[in-house]
Structure formats: structure tokens, C-alpha cells
Amino acid sequence: MNKAQFIKLLEQEGYPQPIEVKQVPNGSLGDHTHPFAVMALVTEGSIDLTIEGQTKAYEPGDVFQLRFEELHAESYGPDGVTYLASRK
């Protein structure tokens, strides 16, 4: 998915305009939650998300979503990760 398609998807799903988020190479965040739902488009690098014991990798062009208060862990690839994220 490209940025224009992602912006359109956000609008359809009732999300506000996204912000750019950058995470460091080989970084990680252990299990945590957010008090909001997230929809994000990976634009550079890679991120692995672990939810309910299942890990999935996301690379440029991939979209990931997290539900409100969904417990998850994050790990970032050797080039870190940059993504556009919107929350509601």
C-alpha cells in the first residue's frame, strides 16, 4: 500500500491524519498496551509485532493494526523502522 491509499483507508475507518514514527535499529519494547487503537503503514525498515504469542513481520508497504489496549511486543529490524501511525 502506498501513502495515498493509506490516507484514504484512514479516512474510511474514521482515523485522523497520521504522524511519522521512527524507531531505532534492533530496538524493542516488551509487552505493553496503548489506550487507543492504532493503524500504521510501514514506510522504511521493518517491525515484528507479537500478539497472543504470534509474531508477524511488517515491511515497507505493509499496514498493521492494534486494537484499544491490545497487549503486544515490538522489535525493530537492523535498519530500525519508520511508519505513519494514526490512533483513535
Predicted regions and their residues:
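Fe(II)/2-oxoglutarate oxygenase catalytic core
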Residues: 1-2
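Short, surface-exposed secondary-structure edge patches
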Residues: 30, 39, 54-57
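Conserved short histidine dyad/triad with adjacent acidic residue
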Residues: 16-34, 67-69
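N-terminal acidic leader/helix
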Residues: 8-15
